[in-house]
Amino acid sequence: MSLGELLETCRSRRIELWSEAGRLRYRAPQGALDAGLAERLRAEREALLEHLEGGPGWRAEPDMAHQRFPLTPVQAAYVLGRQAAFDYGGNACQLYAEYDWPADTDPARLEAAWNAMVERHPMLRAVIEDNAWQRVLPEVPWQRLTVHACAGLDEAAFQAHLERVRERLDHACAALDQWPVLRPELSIGRDACVLHCSVDFTLVDYASLQLLLGEWRRRYLDPQWTAEPLEATFRDYVGVEQRRRQSPAWQRDRDWWLARLDALPGRPDLPLRVQPDTRSTRFRHFHARLDEAAWQALGARAGEHGLSAAGVALAAFAETIGRWSQAPAFCLNLTVLNRPPLHPQLAQVLGDFTALSLLAVDSRHGDSFVERARRIGEQMFDDLDHPTFSGVDLLRELARRRGRGADLMPVVFTSGIGSVQRLLGDGEAPRAPRYMISQTPQVWLDCQVTDQFGGLEIGWDVRLGLFPEGQAEAMFDDFVGLLRRLAQSPRAWTDGDATEPVEAPPQALPGSARSIAAGFAERALLTPDATAIHDAAGSYSYRQVAQHASALRRVLEAHGAGRGRRVAVMLPKSAAQLVAVIGILQAGAAYVPVDIRQPPLRRQAILASAEVVALVCLESDVPDVGCACVAIDRLAADSAWPPPPAAEVAADDLAYVIYTSGSTGTPKGVMLSHAAVSNTLLDINQRYGVDANDRVLGLAELSFDLSVYDFFGATAAGAQVVLPDPARGSDPSHWAELLERHAITLWNSVPAQGQMLIDYLESEPQRHLPGPRCVLWSGDWIPVSLPTRWWRRWPDSALFSLGGATEAAIWSIEQPIRPQHTELASIPYGRALRGQSVEVLDARGRRCPPGVRGEIHIGGVGLALGYAGDPQRTAERFVRHPDGRRLYRTGDLGRYLADGSIEFLGREDDQVKIRGHRIELAELDAALCAHPQVNLAATVVLGETHERSLASFVTLHAPVEAGEDPRTALDAVRQRAAQALRRDWGSEEGIAAAVAALDRACLASLAAWLAGSGLFASATPLDLATLCQRLGIAEARQRLLRHWLRQLEEGGYLRAEGEGWLGCAERPAQSPEDAWTAFAGCAPAALWPAELVAYLRDSAQSLGEQLAGRISPAALMFPQGSARIAEAMYSQGLHAQALHEAMAEAIAAIVERQPQRRWRLLELGAGTAAASRTVIARLAPLVQRGAEVDYLFTDVSSYFLAAARERFADQPWVRFGRFDMNGDLLDQGVAPHSVDILLSSGALNNALDTPALLAGLRELLSADAWLVIQELTREHNEISVSQSLMMENPRDLRDERRQLFVHTGQWLEWLAAQGGDLACGVVPPGSALDLLGYDVLLARCKTDRARLEPAELLAFVEARVPRYMLPAQLRVLERLPVTGNGKIDRKALTGFARQPQADLRHGVAQAPADELENALLALWREVLDNPSLGVEQDFFGAGGDSLLIAQLIARLRERLESARRHPFDRLLRWALSQPTPRGLAERLRSAPEEGRGPALAAARGVAPAPAGMSRAPLAEGAVALDPLVRLVPGEGVPRVLVHEGLGTLLPYRPLLRALGEGRPLLGLAVHDSDAYLAIPAEHLNACLGRRYAEALHRAGLREVDLLGYCSGGLVALETAKSLVQRGVRVRQLDIVSSYRIPYRVDDERLLLFSFAATLGLDTAALGFPAPERLGQAVQAALAQTPERLVAEALAGLPGLADLVALRGRVLQAASGSADAVSVERDTLYRLFCHSVRASQAEAPEPYVGALRLFVPDAGNPLVPRYAEALETQWRAAALGACGIHEVPGGHFDCLGEALAQSLSKPMPEEASR
């Protein structure tokens, strides 16, 4: 019996245990403590005492009874979950219950009894304050019960009244900060009385409610009853729990849980709606009951198996969830009644004693229910033996390690079995409620079971809007049904999984037990002169093919071919292939196709594995192999007719072996029998009515099993097979020729080929071709848009989706495609073909419920014989079901739909399909690892279903040849750096004295502040919790307080005593003022400038104000945004200058040692550029002399980045980027293995976990890389009382040791262990810098790693795998990421692959490609006055603005003839959209001249279109808007940005880098101003939507994400509607701060203000009042005339009277001068006004899909209650879900990084709030 079981036994027998003065005490009912249990208690005495004393003892604090105290972790979670900002939040943790009371209940007496309860129980007088504290009010007024007198109502009316009360209360969310929180109500009818209780569980839990109801009833029945006074309080209990967190027991439990954390599974993967409503706050209650007899029977059966009834109920719940979870391993969230025996009266106290515990379940483990129940029970008891580290703590740690969302564990099990009744004891037992429902934040499903009312009450509360229709009911019925079976049947406990009744095994079709070539032979005899096949050389009849095959057969038989033998075929696509396979099969042998285009090494592997006796090929392709080679083109046909009959074969003889990609790195041969394949051929021919009138286009290669049907299925029906010319086999225009020439009736291909054909034909709209009557697509996902596009051209084609596996005779499942299927997420997989079965089974072989993902298994007559020469793999994939059937595990995932058909969901293993080719990733990995320098390799799949590509990652071995001794180089660099430190430091004694004086001043200030807590006046030690409460220290600052207390200990102010501290009697007496004066008097100004001293003093003297939030630490350091204090701290001091020069000299020495090497530098936490200035200045001469340097300056703050861009604008080799050291290092745009020198000045210490940071940074370092780091190397008290207030708490050994900084030795240890092979410090011990606590640290890393270019490796692999298997990306990593269980983390690799690689690879400026780029580059340099710019330089990134770009366009039109052909505003928009010389050159090359209409196809010669996009010219007569702009190339679904009111993409510039995400980023911008203005305003948005949708559609896009800001949101809405009509899928529609103006604007002043604000002009300088004042005036005017803002409505505001002058000021500011570009600026203004007028149109027709609305949290000063107005408008604009999200900023400045992060989340997780 474990300790947990022993405690549970005591609890079940109502035995109370507690410790007292080191002794074990107990209180037990008569007879409860028998001899055996007493002996167990004695044996476990020490363990019990350790458990009971696991935290501090009980401490009653009656004098603090009415002081606020903290929330428990669960209470805090409940309060936080009330916030609607969280998914699945926005509701209280609340129970609503109704109880029947006698009809004659006296309301006054019941009210008096209630108030007696309020007086007795403090938590009935409690409130929540500031969402973080709870407080018991000392006195409260008499609480009146709400009484509904309904005696005059009949039964129906009374029931209607009860429904109204229930509707009001059952989801109530009480105000926790207002007493009373609990407000019972009473409804008194004619013959009934009902008590309504809406209880917020934040204050009292379910067990407390039962105690309360029992005492309340008892007091009502006996008003004289008085319970013994309560000496224990919930507040005292919380105090114990708070102190317990400092105990060894808490640390032990924490270590135990964290050791398991990485292995814990996630939440149950239950099927959810396509768009679950994450904002829903409504729940539905399900209830069932086992009567007392059934419950006792279940308990008895549980006992027979050594289980408790409560454990069985939990196991049954886990079993049910496991049945419906798509992941077999998951965590359940258990609510635990946490009332430890800390005090004898604690069982009578009301409060929320709830704790949470995560229970890991793996539903695959255990062959019977009993085994699984035992395993769950054992795990639960293990968990409950470590209770002090709470489930909430664990969830927080999960979120920290795995990211946001990992802490959502929404499936809850709440058991009151035994525990509630034990708690109630012999008291008044409450009655069962007549109705009950509960809600909990962040919970999807809460299962509650209790036996307190006799029998077992079963309740589920399920959040609405999440699960598909009917699923919750089905799950609940499964659970209840399982409990009933366990109560009734002994077999339910011990039998394995009961399988569903199995239908009879599928039967083969009559006539299918024959050779697959028999049908061809019959047709050859029946119609010998009919055409059998066409190829590039001509046509051949059945007779000709048969005669040639007969000749080949004779030769092959001479070489040993016959039954049981195999012959390889290696021929190009031609009629010879059909001849070869017929001849081989006529000989009784099996054929083995070998693709002639495959690399020689792979061909050799296939031939060796297949053990062929002969090879059929062309004379020109005879390979050097160990078998006979027969040149088919040298054989003459047999003249005899009819040919001899085929050799006899059995139905189960081998027909062919097709090799597919193999998981072991070598191809695997799939062996198919004649009977298996013949069944499929016969079914397809009958199903689709194939006959001699059909012509099949044979696109599939012979090595792809679709060709089996082309050659044997089609010819068996007498059809003709048409083969493409192998030289044009991938050319869709050639396929179109064949369609036309041969009138193809049957199309059989992978979907990608069908899409290629349609893509081509849509670029040739005038070409009309006959279409196939029947289309078979298989082998890969079918894009849902493809059928619609196909039907648009050939509406009479019957389309079919087929699926299966090479291991199961070509196809096994079929789905006729209907128009409604194109509206789904994917085309359904369908139902099994005849003679076959296709099932979705879970990990235990059970048929999955509808909607639950499982593995697809194929059975029936079509199964392969196995894999050639590989019995082990055959046994792994071809399995026996428990019912005896042989099944093939496909590795494909699927689920049943409601109608019983199957939906395909992808793969579960490392096998993928790329454009129809089945690829084992392991084979590619093996080819990569064959390179002698590659150690490990891993490949992942990128992209959506039909746009997939591969990304491979490798790690390298150590280099074979040893180079220079790394120590020699390190020492040489150290010496160079040390020389740079030499200077006149003055007296070292004086420096040491100043450092000591500074420490004393800081400690004196700390002690003075701490005195306010009463610490120095207290005679007893004060612990940390007490100090935090008295000083108002938040939990986040407790670690800093611990550090300060330690420093004061060392300074002689305090001494530690137990868990607290006492003031020292002989502590330093120096006042803070005197101490700071003393320091200022001895501090050398060269080291501590006066401004720095003043800052340190001010910060130390205002600690209380800073901690309370009254003074901002950042504002102290950067007063009014000035960096002068930071300059004094980081740049001006003599020590700072010396340290930075040492860093610079070290880096120069490193570069000079290998001048031919390209050096990529990454500076972390560059901040004010204090070190960067010196380093860059030192490197600049080296760059000028030819050194190739790429310097990336990074910081987490945009403030510092902006300043650095300006400072280093003259250094084109210096780039800038945001980098967060505490974020995911591999998710910030810096590619792994790409940094040669990493430098940092004083920043690494700011990391939360510096060793982990160094380990992560190592991933970024290339082979033979360097680290150059400057850091603080002792405790700096001046930092602890200043900048530490802006720093987060460290999580490494600094936290354990209560330090802020570490010494040089620790830094070197970290570097040696994590970041460098060799490391050293530069500063000599005892020197001035050492006394000051600084050092420069050098490390040389990865000297044992090889250098290998990806291009070299790719060329190596190309010789070993087919081209379709080559990775699109190939990257070198330091190590492959692994999951917690040691497996390669492919999710992390996919994240790496989606990161841009350009940041550290393209540092060298590219030369202009032609004269146009050269001319534009010259203009760029001239206008920006920067001769070092390159053709990829962003105009705005180099310091440009709207004025300068207008000047650039003006000069461009003066100097370039090609530019003069376009109007100014078109050129301006192009430049705004693509603001680089190369980007603008692309537009000029591809654009038509004025008046000619666009020609997007011309762009093909300049740059490739984005992935998934095929550019095509518009039809003749199309409006010349040419709106489509390519912003960022990439792969995947493009994101399209829709222009705002100016017609440009300028506002989106802050988002471009963040939104690239490795996928295409396109823009829609106004191309022709006149055409834009010609559209009536009331029709503008709809018209633009149609035109833009047409442009996107004609560009070949079939799936997009749309983003519209401001008025662009309205255009985006219309574009989305039109795209859907054209069959283009709008995956996401994102609207940002877009407002339809509900009134007409006749006062131009408002338009001018909005125009100026949109351009970013200074509106105050232009004479406008503050935006808030302007908004007030607008609202005042609209109050008079709500439908329009009349002219002159705003004229009374200061500065706005003269409209003409105001307009002139705005337009002049817009163009930059009074005269220049006046026409263009006026056009821009006209465009803007036109867009505004369009925004005043009537509300549009709603969009049928979903959208996301992003609302700026600062609102729009011109629109009151802006968020509410936006939400109202956009909810009405979409029939689908409308997700509402707040983003930082106001309307004019909300397009920032926070918005980019929000946009990155996919729409399927959005829902209506």
Swiss-Prot record:
Q: Which domain of life is it from?
A: Bacteria
Instruction: Write the Enzyme Commission number(s) for this entry.
Output: 6.2.1.69
PROSITE patterns found in the cross-reference section: AMP_BINDING, CARRIER, PHOSPHOPANTETHEINE
Q: Does the keyword ATP-binding apply?
A: no
* One GO CC term, this protein: cytoplasm
Record's keyword terms, sorted: Ligase, Phosphopantetheine, Phosphoprotein
Question: Per the record, which residues fall in region Adenylation?
Answer: 520-915
Pathway assigned to this chain's UniProt record: Siderophore biosynthesis
Q: Tell me a GO biological process for this protein.
A: secondary metabolite biosynthetic process
Where are residues bearing O-(pantetheine 4'-phosphoryl)serine located in the sequence? 1442
Induction is noted as:
Expression of the pchEF operon is strictly dependent on the PchR regulator and is induced by extracellular pyochelin, the end product of the pathway. Repressed by Fur and iron.
Cofactor(s) demanded: pantetheine 4'-phosphate
Presence of the UniProt keyword Ligase in the record: yes
Q: What class of enzyme is it?
A: ligase
Condensation/cyclization as annotated region, ranges: 69-490
Query: CDD domains of this UniProt entry?
Result: A_NRPS_TlmIV_like (cd12114), Cyc_NRPS (cd19535)
Which reaction is this enzyme known to catalyze?
holo-[peptidyl-carrier protein] + L-cysteine + ATP = L-cysteinyl-[peptidyl-carrier protein] + AMP + diphosphate
Q: Which residue range or ranges hold the Carrier domain?
A: 1407-1488
Instruction: Provide the phenotype resulting from gene inactivation.
Output: Mutant can still form salicylate and Dha, but is no longer able to synthesize pyochelin.
Q: Where is this region: Thioesterase?
A: 1584-1797
- Which GO molecular function, any one, fits this protein according to its record? phosphopantetheine binding
Q: Which family does it belong to?
A: Belongs to the NRP synthetase family.
Task: Return the domain comment text from this UniProt entry.
Answer: Modular protein that contains a condensation/cyclization domain involved in the cyclization of the cysteine, an adenylation domain which activates the cysteine residue into an aminoacyl-AMP ester, a peptidyl carrier protein (PCP2) domain which bears a phosphopantetheinyl arm to attach the activated cysteine and a thioesterase domain (TE) that may release the newly synthesized peptide from the enzyme.
- Entry function: Involved in the biosynthesis of the siderophore pyochelin. Adenylates L-cysteine and loads it onto its peptidyl carrier domain via a thioester linkage to the phosphopanthetheine moiety. Then forms a peptide bond between the salicyl-thiazolinyl intermediate bound to the second carrier domain of PchE and the cysteine bound to its own peptidyl carrier domain to form the salicyl-thiazolinyl-cysteinyl-S-PCP2 intermediate. It subsequently cyclizes the C-terminal cysteine to form the second thiazoline heterocycle in the salicyl-thiazolinyl-thiazolinyl-S-PCP2 intermediate.
Protein name, UniProt field: Pyochelin synthetase PchF
The record lists the organism as: Pseudomonas aeruginosa (strain ATCC 15692 / DSM 22644 / CIP 104116 / JCM 14847 / LMG 12228 / 1C / PRS 101 / PAO1)
**Gene that encodes the chain:** pchF
